[in-house]
């Protein structure tokens, strides 16, 4: 018999270095006073992202579980999500009134998607440093995620990327789905992401 609330599960995906862990850090710090939050991270051989969040004091250590997938990170969030589902359940049992569990995928490519059994909402993170062509390359992360985060806009002048081109391409690839340009170091765009989570996740304000 289930003796805990079913939290909102938010999958956070994106290529290595795009800013997934940085996003989770700022989200947790901004939302933890209003909501009960926990995090599951995925790494192939280590628990490095979990350690980063713990060191940053994003949440108490008992609210973070690092899953070592030991293989293709896509499989652990899609075809066989059992390890992640078990981690979510463990966190929900530890903290009976959880509102949100973020599930961060291991570094993946544009074709990775979350199993609907694992994530109620999905956020996909790309970054400007990968080049302005990234949005038009498509893939499920770009086209099907519930929210697309285009991070590190401050780097655009240094990598020769046009934010105007990126926005036009993103609008073509996601004509009815939301996206946001961010600089997470300066918290630019953070409130838009929080509002999306609250509204789409039907959380209390």
UniProtKB/Swiss-Prot annotation:
SUPFAM superfamilies registered for this protein in UniProt: P-loop containing nucleoside triphosphate hydrolases (SSF52540)
Entry binding sites for GTP: 14-21
Intracellular or extracellular location(s): Cytoplasm
GO BP terms, alphabetized: urea catabolic process
Domain of life: Bacteria
Keywords annotated in UniProt: Chaperone, Cytoplasm, GTP-binding, Nickel insertion, Nucleotide-binding, Virulence
Molecular function, one GO term: nickel cation binding
A Gene Ontology cellular-component term: cytoplasm
Quaternary structure annotation from Swiss-Prot or TrEMBL: Homodimer. UreD, UreF and UreG form a complex that acts as a GTP-hydrolysis-dependent molecular chaperone, activating the urease apoprotein by helping to assemble the nickel containing metallocenter of UreC. The UreE protein probably delivers the nickel.
Known function: Facilitates the functional incorporation of the urease nickel metallocenter. This process requires GTP hydrolysis, probably effectuated by UreG.
Annotated family: Belongs to the SIMIBI class G3E GTPase family. UreG subfamily.
The protein, known as: Urease accessory protein UreG
Organism: Proteus mirabilis (strain HI4320)
